Amino acid sequence: MDRQSVVKSTAIPFPLNFDNEKYDDMYKAYNKIMVLARDLNAFIETPEFVFIGKDGNGKSALIESFIGFPMMIGEGSSLRPLHITLMNNARCEEPIVTFKRDRSLDSYEFDRQIELSMVSSEISKRNQKTSIPIEITIEYRYYLNMLLIEPPSVSIQPTNAITIQGQSMTSPANQLANKIAKLSIGNEMGEMITQYTKSNNRTLVFVETSTNGGTNSSEMLELAKKLDYKLDRSIFVFNKFHSLLTGDQPFTNGRDANRFLGSPSIGAPTFFTTLPSTAQRSQCNSKDQLSQLCDQLQQTDLNILEQLQFDKKYERNVGLSAFRHWISEFTWRKYLDSVPEVLKRLNSFRTTSEDQLYQIRQQLERTNAVTLRQIANSYVSIEFIQCIEKLVTRTLEGNPSLNGQTLEEEKSQDETGDWYDHNGKPILLLNDEKLVTFYDNKLYGGQQFERLLTEFKCITEVIQLEELSISEVACAIGSNRPSNASVIAWAASDLAQKKIKEALLPLVDQLFKRATYILRRLVDIVDRMIENKKKSSFRRHGNSTSLFQDNSSPSSQSQSQSSSISQSASLSSENMIYGIQSINGSDSVSRPSHENTIVNVEDHPYFIYSVKEMYFKYVDQIAADCKNKCMDEFYTTRLIYWDLQSNKDLKKFCTDSPCVSLNNSLNNNNKSTTPGNNNNNNNNNSNNNYNNSNHILNPKETHTMVTELASKLFQDIRNRMSKNIMLKCYNYFLIPMQMDLKLNIQDNITKLSDAMLEEIFEIQTTKERLREDEQHLAQICNQFIQQEENYKKYSQSFSHPFPSAVRN
């Protein structure tokens, strides 16, 4: 029924009957606006109303009359809070009532749809004392979305009439109870009221019985001032107004009526209603019957006031229709304030998608060999190689706690493992492992390489000369008689060189295997460094032109649009976002500094793979060159350590040997038998020495002498060779990684032909994908344009509602 047929109010600009079918266009427009807002992930706050009142004041009757359908909600019979959600649904010609699942009770684990006539009985079944609310959803095409909350009824007594027992008087609930007057049902009700009223977006509807004392004696007013001290979100409804007009002390004239209706003590919207009793509502079988009954009661009150000649300005405060229209307009204005925000968001998405479409078209135009070569050179020289050089020298950008490796973690990899000797037995440092620098710290790059060399040095120091067999000594001496130091030196030198080669060659192989692994794993760290640089750039330049960067974009809402937008987002490479000319070379979104060179790995996987392959080949090449340099230490001609001939230790060793002692004794005997032949002795001095040196040692003596001398030579050669190998690893492995890597890879990129560049960048596939994405984005742009036009039309219909008959 049209409101104008009941109340001729001029205070409300657009008087809406909440469920008036004459405003069908307005409700259709509202439905379209809400659907689009949901697709755009635009938050629109739903108005919420909390009805607070005592038993018997008509709170449940007010809610039922406001909803507009007879449901026989029991007055004061609810022990639980009641949440009634009114939801607009354009497909519901008749209201659909759904009770949400109630896990606090058995056998109510699922949602249930019931008839309007069964609402009261269903509430009675669930009516058990608990703070968990009964949730009801009513869908109807002539509703605006809102939430009606009815806590259990309160009973207020004078402040000195009751004292709360058994609870701490300092608790928030008791403090509230003391301030607002004692609640007879205890602190539990005080906490519940506080919980439901503390949200600022909720409107509080205080329901009370009309009395002769007027609003000055209102019990709810003091409660309202404590819950909402400004009363800027409070509404007062004084029910049973007809009983006051026709009671024992009725108004005698219009002045008394005006004084009562215009009481200034409240300062908040106030309404005086007469609602159908429970018996009257039970006789209503339809919406129209309930509406006619409410209108008759309202008209009766207005007729009495007319007889008293009351001021017409108070007419807007009398009757259920006035209250309903105030709530309707309040809700309508709430949604009306959200219309520009949704339009702004829609316009933002449209603009963003158009910018993306423009950038993709720029990509297609500038997809050529020149641009590709610029991208390749920029990425290789500024990003990839720069990160490698930082890791080889020193940097914290690689996040050592995440990407670094301890010595144990490094050895646990399949490409590395423990150290093994030439017999395949593991070489363990045991307690000497602590001699390895930073053995328990996470390292990468150059620092990890240096730790490897330190470990190699410790491992070589553990290596000792194995026991030499008599056969090996005999073969080393050959046909020469071991009668002097030079023969022994030759044999010991030869054995030491062969044994050191046998012992160190496996270690050198393992050294370069692990060194290659350390440098090859840097590419994974570089990928993470570049990714972190992208994330930091996103944070610095949050206002990107990319549609997909907005987490609340419609791509995540509407299934019809999600696939298109997500595909268009994937194609709009982050190169565009960072302004790298990633195929498009657009300067419109360029950023300063080195961030212009960031390339999205996902956009050009084969190019990135090719760069990594160039790096791997370079690492393998310098590893092979360095290893050849180290092998020069082993590939020597047969030589003797001539310094042994003049070495004091060797001379002492030969002097103390058994053969020399024997020769000396023979010489002394000759001297004693021929004492007078001094000249002969002097002349034969050299001959005696010759005989001494040519004395033939037995195999055991020879083995002992050669073994001891070879062991000493083994240690000297081992120390010298390990030191030289470490120096060559620095000079021919680590330093080229710092100095020559950029030139090598840059040269390889420069030598690539245009055809090879297009193949590496998959230019044909990229163009096909860009064309597909261009079509998708063009379609999305058209959809946004169409939606924007429709939204403007819907917002116009919603902002200026008129009955359909008037519009026609």
Swiss-Prot record:
- Supply the EC number(s): 3.6.5.5
Q: Which Pfam families match?
A: Dynamin_N (PF00350)
Region (Disordered) residue ranges read 536-565, 665-695
Region (G3 motif) residue spans: 150-153
Give the highest taxon in the source lineage: Eukaryota
Gene Ontology biological process terms, A to Z: actin filament organization; midbody abscission; mitotic cytokinesis; protein localization to cleavage furrow
Q: Where are the transmembrane segments?
A: none
Describe the inactivation phenotype. Answer: Produced cells are larger and a large amount of them contains more than 2 nuclei.
Asked if GTP-binding is a keyword of the record, the answer is yes
The segment annotated G1 motif runs over 53-60
Q: What is this protein called?
A: Dynamin-like protein B
Recorded source organism is: Dictyostelium discoideum
Protein encoded by which gene: dlpB
